[in-house]
Amino acid sequence: MKTALVILAAGKGTRMNSDLPKVLHPLAGAPLLIHAMQSGASLGPSRTVIVAGHGAELVQKAALSHDASAIIVQQTEQLGTGHAAKQAQDALKGFDGTVVVLFGDTPFVSPDTLSAICDAQRSADVVVLGFEAADPARYGRLVMDGAQLDRIVEYKDATEAERAITLCNSGVVACNGTRLFELLEAVDNDNAAGEFYLPDIVGVARARGLTAAVVTCDESETLGINSRTELSAAEAAFQERARTNAFENGVTLPAPGTVHFAFDTVVGRDTLIEPNVVFGPGVTIESGATIRAFSHLEGCHVARGSVVGPYARLRPGAELSENVRVGNFVEVKNARIGTGTKINHLSYIGDATLGEYTNVGAGTITCNYDGVLKHHTEIGNHVFIGSNTMLVAPVQIGDHAMTGSGSVITSDVEPEALALSRAPQIEKPGMATKIINLLRAKKAKQQRGS
């Protein structure tokens, strides 16, 4: 059966106390909205509709950058979740499959749970996602009639018996596309807030003799984020889950609580990740690599057997082939490093291609920016770059070439050539002692004057 997603992302997020729309606050390196979109994408939806409101332009930009086919609609007035869902009606015109309504601030609903919701919708007119709450607090309660969902009761309206129910409402629903909007049309705003609530479609459906079912999930999947405190708790939950997954996939983390993963980090088995490593978005680490302490990686690929760090930074576009070494205080950006090449200390390699088994000495800098444009540096195979070499791009260093320490290389270097570019050394006997004596005399004179 075909599915469509409606993701509600119109809320202001007042408790965030931020100019940024709530659904765009980052969790593990990606906006909350993107987490919801990724989870929903597991269903292979034929249409994805994002209901934007507060900060609609920013929400639209983020959504379309992740999925260019997403349909963006606006809720110009925030009149409740039912009213928000109704804004998707035109975008889903003629769609008769299952519509799943998610929330942009609820990032952890799993693909397995979404699949179960869609399966349940084949035999029920309305499906609600519920959870057994450890502390039901003020959640809405799901009142069952045997296997059927009879009604949803908000905490403030519940009797003592209903408040004792621990099966709670997550807010996520699924319904046939045509029927969803028929039910929403009948929902009223006769409540204290004067809003139209999405869960009220259950009462409308039951009054019409339709069926309603509940699919349950772990409470952790339903975590909604409305404040910085809840965002922090969600980050902690994500990181704990990511570390557990890493262990299960054969990754060694001697100090797991100090390693920070992004939402899309991929790490191969038999990789060692030392303490205080941070992964930004877009990192792939192959099997058998080592990421040493205090390194920061984003938008990069590290192949099998490579060693990164300690205190290294790999920026977007860094591509390390097998058995590469990138050592302490080395930064690599938009550069491909060939097999067996070593950049062991205190260097910047940007906008460059390095061949195989090349050695880059300490203090080497690719001078890639002229103040307006970036330029490329090409270094061949089996090259030796002497310490403190400045490579002024655009420049090419041929295979088996060498550069002398302290050189400023501004022109291409032929294969097997030695390139030197520095002033000749001048030695003046006894001059060091004379200079020291002059300086000491000057210092003594200054002290007498004070």
UniProtKB/Swiss-Prot annotation:
A molecular function GO annotation: glucosamine-1-phosphate N-acetyltransferase activity
Positions of the UniProt region annotated as N-acetyltransferase: 250-450
Chief localisation class: cytoplasm
Output the HAMAP family linked to this UniProt entry. Answer: GlmU
The family line of this record is: In the N-terminal section; belongs to the N-acetylglucosamine-1-phosphate uridyltransferase family.
Cofactor(s) it depends on? Mg(2+)
User: What biological function has been recorded for the protein in this entry?
Assistant: Catalyzes the last two sequential reactions in the de novo biosynthetic pathway for UDP-N-acetylglucosamine (UDP-GlcNAc). The C-terminal domain catalyzes the transfer of acetyl group from acetyl coenzyme A to glucosamine-1-phosphate (GlcN-1-P) to produce N-acetylglucosamine-1-phosphate (GlcNAc-1-P), which is converted into UDP-GlcNAc by the transfer of uridine 5-monophosphate (from uridine 5-triphosphate), a reaction catalyzed by the N-terminal domain.
Region of interest (Pyrophosphorylase), residue spans: 1-228
Protein name in the entry: Bifunctional protein GlmU
Signal peptide limits: none
Named in its record, the pathway it takes part in is: Nucleotide-sugar biosynthesis; UDP-N-acetyl-alpha-D-glucosamine biosynthesis; N-acetyl-alpha-D-glucosamine 1-phosphate from alpha-D-glucosamine 6-phosphate (route II): step 2/2; Nucleotide-sugar biosynthesis; UDP-N-acetyl-alpha-D-glucosamine biosynthesis; UDP-N-acetyl-alpha-D-glucosamine from N-acetyl-alpha-D-glucosamine 1-phosphate: step 1/1; Bacterial outer membrane biogenesis; LPS lipid A biosynthesis
> Which GO cellular component terms are attached?
cytoplasm; membrane
InterPro entries this protein is in?
A: Bifunctional_GlmU, GlmU-like, GlmU_C_LbH, Hexapep, MobA-like_NTP_Trfase, Nucleotide-diphossugar_trans, Trimer_LpxA-like_sf
What top-level branch of life does the organism fall under? Answer: Bacteria
Q: Where, subcellularly, is it found?
A: Cytoplasm
Linker: annotated span: 229-249
Q: Which gene encodes it?
A: glmU
Can you tell me which residues bind Mg(2+)? 105, 226
- Could you give the cofactor binding note from the entry? Binds 1 Mg(2+) ion per subunit.
Name any one Pfam family assigned in the record.
NTP_transf_3
Assembly behavior: Homotrimer.
